[in-house]
């Protein structure tokens, strides 16, 4: 197979998993890294998992800069836009989180259009879809959008929401043949190829290390990173996927207390500090008035 795919953010939890699946499928893969210092580690990690990397190439490119994106897109049929702007400290002003996310996807779409890329698949998230649906009897679908002024919506979630909206606006307002689709994963867990994990792993970390003395009875939707990677490839290659959004989730929900119980039963050696005592919902509601994490947690009740 000579088709070339660009994957942005190749050193990340999801990005590296997508690269591994594409290489196993026989694609030529190019990936972007903010620094090529990570190139050897990415190759080593993939090789350690018995994945051949002869068809993998690298370009140094940053979502916040115009340089090198034309080079990254050259001869690519597909682009999987996985990377998000990186912040080591979350700025106080949410616009400093939102603006780079919007400008980043616009930068990718402009370069893809210029390079005559066939289709771009963007990694969005479920926070852009279902956080304004308060009716427990109704089902959130790809037709739904979260209200950007939803109380408790974090700057990160808002940045993903507004970046996806900006992407759809770009595609729909352009007179070109660029195809587009989005993947909207819920809490993404599963095995990592290296030490990089998703932000959703903070849920597990806080349960394992005893940070949560009482566990909020929050229902969660989760999805395996391997399924999300495969869904990106299906959205890339399936003709009917053009102009569509796809929620990535496993069947049903699991609560945080249920996750705590699973850790205790399945990995007791990790659960010496794991609490299974439930935090009453009204306490979480009270805490939401003063605590950012509690406010974000209340959003999921």
Predicted regions and their residues:
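Conserved Rossmann-fold NAD(P)-dependent oxidoreductase catalytic core, especially the SDR/UDP-sugar
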Residues: 81, 85, 90-156
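Mid/C-terminal beta-alpha module of Rossmann-like enzyme folds, strongest
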Residues: 231-296
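NAD(P)H-binding glycine-rich loop region in Rossmannoid oxidoreductase-like domains
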Residues: 36-37, 46-103
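Active-site Tyr-X1-5-Lys
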Residues: 150-180
